[in-house]
From Swiss-Prot, chain A:
<keyword id="KW-0735">Signal-anchor</keyword>
<comment type="similarity">
    <text>Belongs to the peptidase S26B family.</text>
</comment>
<comment type="subunit">
    <text>Component of the signal peptidase complex (SPC) composed of a catalytic subunit SEC11 and three accessory subunits SPC1, SPC2 and SPC3. The complex induces a local thinning of the ER membrane which is used to measure the length of the signal peptide (SP) h-region of protein substrates. This ensures the selectivity of the complex towards h-regions shorter than 18-20 amino acids. SPC associates with the translocon complex.</text>
</comment>
<keyword id="KW-0812">Transmembrane</keyword>
<keyword id="KW-1133">Transmembrane helix</keyword>
<feature type="transmembrane region" description="Helical; Signal-anchor for type II membrane protein">
    <location>
        <begin position="7"/>
        <end position="24"/>
    </location>
</feature>
<feature type="topological domain" description="Cytoplasmic">
    <location>
        <begin position="1"/>
        <end position="6"/>
    </location>
</feature>
<protein>
    <recommendedName>
        <fullName>Signal peptidase complex catalytic subunit SEC11</fullName>
        <ecNumber>3.4.21.89</ecNumber>
    </recommendedName>
</protein>
<feature type="active site" description="Charge relay system">
    <location>
        <position position="83"/>
    </location>
</feature>
<feature type="topological domain" description="Lumenal">
    <location>
        <begin position="25"/>
        <end position="171"/>
    </location>
</feature>
<keyword id="KW-0472">Membrane</keyword>
<feature type="active site" description="Charge relay system">
    <location>
        <position position="113"/>
    </location>
</feature>
<feature type="active site" description="Charge relay system">
    <location>
        <position position="44"/>
    </location>
</feature>
<keyword id="KW-0378">Hydrolase</keyword>
<dbReference type="InterPro" id="IPR019756">
    <property type="entry name" value="Pept_S26A_signal_pept_1_Ser-AS"/>
</dbReference>
<dbReference type="GO" id="GO:0006465">
    <property type="term" value="P:signal peptide processing"/>
</dbReference>
<dbReference type="InterPro" id="IPR019533">
    <property type="entry name" value="Peptidase_S26"/>
</dbReference>
Amino acid sequence: MNIRQQLVQLLNLAMVLSTAFMFWKGLGLVTNSNSPIVVVLSGSMEPAFQRGDILFLWNRDKYVDIGDVVVYEVKGKPIPIVHRVLREHKVTNKDRKVRQLLLTKGDNNPTDDLSLYAHKSNYLDRDEDVLGTVKAYLPKVGYVTILITENKYAKLGLLGLMALSTLLTRE
Amino acid sequence: MSGITKPVNLYSVAELRNATDDALPLALSKLGYEQSFSLIDTKLAIGYVATILAGSLYYLEKKYNNDFSNLTYYYSMVALVVGYFALNGLLWLHGKYREKDIKYVGINKNNQKKISIEARVENNTTPIYKVTVIENNRLLGKQDIPFTGIFDEDGFIHIDQLVEIFTRLLQEKEK
């Protein structure tokens, strides 16, 4: 085997990984969301969404509506949360910029999300905290990623399989 | 030099084709040709530049914590994503219109003439190697080579037979 053939094989592997990554980033740019696809990790939105559902987000609407299901991330807590918008306020700043402030709640939770928000904050900021509104979903498919993130052997096994298959096939 | 020392599975057309593709440089070097790598090098260069773009975006994502409100990050992301897919498009065009089925490009050491060899198989159930030889953009000859003619029963390729076939193919034009 010569060096160019090996470089081609390595390139094929690199292309598989980089194309997946760049599609993800491209989708992020189109939807204007830095995490355009998320997997539901908790049961707090049952029966609307179950653990393992995949959600597709869209973040180009200027304001979100009451009743929309949004995904938000609280500063300092790296896990995105999927909950429904319960109330909203539009506040005009001194620089005449309108901010939309939100209160959210999980359909399956007994109380609203005040206790989940950042320290001393009693609202979410539409522009700063919300990753996007849920526009579509695929039920259960995301369970694979839950398995991978919560079980390190599943993760290693899958990575190994992917690497092997791209290195061994030459079609 | 895989495919020459290693037997292939005679029931797999893909393996037969790969082994024959791999044997072309050796066969043609025996006929006085020196292989030219410009096509594959172009492909490698475009591909690896694209990969570097993706890699640097990965680095930026970590550096800026994937914060879309940071405009430096946002616009470099736009540039890198657009650049990446442009290069991929280029790679696709290169494969479709320049590389096509070309498996070997070589230059004759004596008369400096450049030949390209296109080779393909019709499908995965027809064990016939369809070869087209082009010399300086002029069609030199076509031949369908059944794999039974160049592989023996044990799955070893016979370079001499391949050399013989190409000697005939390359001589035809000189008449």
